[in-house]
A protein has these predicted regions:
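Class I SAM-dependent methyltransferase SAM/SAH-binding core
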Residues: 1-47
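Short "lid" loop at the C-terminus of a central beta-strand within the Rossmann-like core
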Residues: 38-39, 64, 94-99, 142-145
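Hydrophobic beta-strand segment of the Class I
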Residues: 58-59
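Class I S-adenosylmethionine-dependent transferase superfamily signal
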Residues: 62, 78-80, 128
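A short glycine-rich, Lys/Arg-flanked "PGG" loop and its adjoining helix->strand segment in the class I
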Residues: 72-88
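Short, glycine-/aromatic-enriched active-site segment of Class I SAM-dependent methyltransferases
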Residues: 95-115
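Short alpha-helix
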Residues: 116-132
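C-terminal lobe and adjacent flexible extensions of AdoMet/dcAdoMet transferase-like proteins
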Residues: 131-166
Length: 166
């Protein structure tokens, strides 16, 4: 089990709890590395990180919306590259019903609040389908908006998908 974060403070916190978390979940192979989610071939220290097809389950909790739209293509390609045949995705993130305008995208408070980078709902699912994932579904989609800005509804949703094994 490998956790990734680019923030050294978060990594320090994660590593301080690593032993107790590993014993609670019953796995001894828990580690954390400093990396960018859209550059998984090596970590931020220049060390090799993830080979092609080496991850059985990709879990992400409110991270994809923090990636700039200009880097989303690379992000998606990296998720696809590291997912093993037969692998699965479980991604919880923020989606919206209308495109986020530039003025909201440029607001640092809304970026840190997971609003500015929200994925358009239809694009969120289709992006993974276009990569070859199957059974792509939004599950546990929040019916009522979490927040509304400029008439745009923002809500949480969980996406699940599978990569065919053959």
């Amino acid at each position: 089990m490998l956790g990734l974060d680019r923030n050294p403070n978060m990594l320090e916190l994660a590593n301080s709890a690593c032993g107790s978390v590993a014993s609670q979940i019953g796995y001894g192979n828990v580690s954390f590395r400093r990396a960018e989610i859209d550059q998984l071939a090596e970590d931020l220290d220049g060390q090799p990180l993830l080979a092609d097809g080496c991850i059985d389950v990709v879990l992400s909790n409110c991270v994809l919306n923090l990636v700039q739209p200009s880097r989303r293509g690379q992000l998606l390609q990296e998720i696809r590259r590291v997912t093993a045949p037969g692998g699965r995705l479980a991604i919880s993130d923020i989606i919206c019903d209308k495109p986020v305008p530039l003025e909201l995208q440029q607001d640092p408070d809304l970026w840190s609040g997971c609003i500015s980078g929200a994925w358009l709902e239809a694009e969120f699912t289709s992006a993974f389908e276009q990569l070859g994932f199957r059974k792509v579904a939004l599950v546990d989609r929040q019916e009522n908006p979490w927040q509304v800005h400029a008439g745009i509804e923002f809500r949480s949703a969980n996406l699940t998908a599978e990569l065919p094994c053959c």
